[in-house]
A protein has these predicted regions:
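Phosphate-binding beta-loop-alpha motif at adenosine-nucleotide cofactor sites
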Residues: 85-91, 148-153, 158-172
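Nucleotide-sugar-dependent glycosyltransferase donor-binding/catalytic pocket residues
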Residues: 23, 94, 151
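Canonical radical SAM enzyme core domain
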Residues: 94, 118-119
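Generic recognition of short, well-ordered alpha-helical segments
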Residues: 29, 97-100, 157
Length: 172
């Protein structure tokens, strides 16, 4: 991983906590509860997707593949005085690029991952994709047979990758 931008990093303009986890596991609720605290600053955009493995529809305008860290720092420019600065991109649980970047920061952020009983997570995610976003048109049985769906609930595998990448005590 290239760390050309690390030298000029200002710790107070970057998050010291990152919330991730499987989709539909409570990251939005935790984001809003924490952001309401007067000593905590949540990025104005809950999920920045800045360190996603590839450019996708959620981070097309601001991502590590096309921009330097200044674009990421902009999410936290109002929170320099906050004790805790954070964002909550659930998908970072699965993202190799995020692991590589956060583990190479001089000041490693604390990582908090949220999980849910796998069958309930899969069902909730299915309902969202089928009925709310209308991204899929298949039965629940067909949906859960997709390899990526089963991989997304292999929480131990993804959590271990983060625990191997970050210092002890930084992953919860």
């Amino acid at each position: 991983m290239e760390s050309y931008y690390l030298a000029g990093m200002n710790e107070a303009s970057l998050p010291n906590v990152i919330i991730g986890g499987a989709p539909k596991c409570g990251t939005s609720s935790l984001y809003f509860w924490l952001a309401a605290h007067p000593e905590v600053y949540g990025s104005p955009k809950k999920e920045t997707f800045f360190f996603a493995d590839k450019v996708n529809r959620f981070n097309a305008s601001a991502n590590v593949h096309e921009h330097d860290l200044d674009h990421y720092e902009a999410f936290f420019k109002g929170g320099q005085e906050a004790t805790v600065r954070f964002e909550a991109t659930a998908h970072y649980l699965y993202e190799k690029v995020a692991r590589e970047h956060f583990s190479n920061w001089p000041h490693k952020p604390k990582m908090i991952f949220l999980f849910r009983e796998p069958s309930k997570q899969m069902y909730s995610h299915y309902k969202m994709e089928r009925y709310r976003t209308k991204r899929i048109d298949m039965t629940l049985s067909e949906y859960i047979q997709r390899p990526q769906i089963m991989d997304h609930v292999d929480y131990a595998k993804h959590l271990k990758a983060w625990m191997d990448a970050m210092p002890e005590g930084h992953v919860r």
